[in-house]
């Protein structure tokens, strides 16, 4: 399998209420030389996390120990900009398994789905509720249920449904990437091929 199966995730969350976060902010271009997916988490939001002398910027959210979890909650239009898949790699390598926003750039959304990070798009109103709940209590938990396609703010019980492509959903539930999926249905492909008269 390419990555762990994703069924239900219950976790606290890290709030990043900034709109139009682009892929160059997620992972600066100077860190894109590697071709493997490992190690990019160290440079996630590098220019926001660190000063020029590599000391942590105390006010940036990832450097605040009271916020942690496997869910990143971002502002509207998250993942815009260039199509670099390294942005999704950095998010996964850092430890996030889900990103919540009121809107995602299409290419970024697909890059996340391809590596096992679930992008959950919610309404603007629900996103605001999530931010407020986290600020009121940083340990508040969110439940993401991929099977039912629901996101629940456990502190209030407020719930909203989210959409996902059926093929991508099946892959995430099984921990498949595209190659894993093809290998899984190889016998079906061969049977179909053998049944063709040409």
Task: Cite the ranges covered by each PLM segment.
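Cytosolic catalytic domains that perform sulfur/thiol-centered chemistry
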Residues: 1-198
């Amino acid at each position: 399998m390419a990555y762990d199966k994703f069924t239900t995730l219950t976790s606290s969350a890290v709030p990043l209420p900034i709109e139009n976060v682009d892929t160059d902010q997620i992972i600066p271009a100077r860190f894109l030389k590697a071709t493997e997916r490992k190690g990019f988490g160290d440079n996630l939001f590098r220019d926001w996390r660190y000063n020029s002398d590599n000391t942590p910027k105390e006010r940036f959210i990832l450097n605040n120990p009271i916020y942690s979890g496997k869910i990143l909650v971002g502002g509207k239009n998250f993942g815009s900009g260039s199509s670099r898949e390294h942005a999704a790699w950095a998010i996964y390598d850092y430890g996030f398994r889900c990103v919540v926003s009121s809107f995602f750039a299409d290419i970024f959304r697909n890059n996340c789905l391809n590596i096992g990070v679930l992008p959950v798009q919610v309404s603007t109103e629900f996103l605001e509720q999530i931010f407020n709940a986290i600020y009121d209590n940083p340990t508040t938990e969110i439940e993401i249920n991929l099977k039912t396609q629901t996101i629940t703010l456990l502190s209030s019980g407020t719930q909203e449904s989210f959409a996902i492509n059926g093929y991508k959903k099946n892959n995430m539930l099984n921990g498949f990437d595209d190659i894993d999926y093809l290998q899984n249905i190889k016998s079906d492909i061969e049977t179909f091929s053998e049944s063709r008269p040409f």
